[in-house]
Amino acid sequence: MIEIERIRAALTKRPRFADRVFTEEERRYCFSRPNPAQHFAARFAGKEAVGKAIGCGVEFMWRDIEIAGRPKPSVTLSGKVAELAERFGAGDIDLSMTHSKGMAAAVAIVQSRGTQGPLNQAV
């Protein structure tokens, strides 16, 4: 969950923020919407949720997780995040994103491929 205003401020004060965090396709989509900050915030929350669900926390290249699609978001992994997902036995990723006037949130569920790995261990 993230405050939309934090993303709006980052987009305004740090011109390279969008380039560092979002893929070209994500930027194109968000900037085409009437209120880009809320769409960027939802995708930011989505990336964070996916990273945590896979098991890499928030220590990853943000652009290694791309969120596309409307109305149902789809997730594409690349780079180190894709390598970790493979090693951890990650399968399909279900993602739900939402935003209100002031907040954006996301929940990610990573399904196991049924192989050995951290995603298959009981907690």
Predicted regions and their residues:
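Core catalytic alpha/beta fold that binds nucleotide/phospho-ligands
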Residues: M1-V123
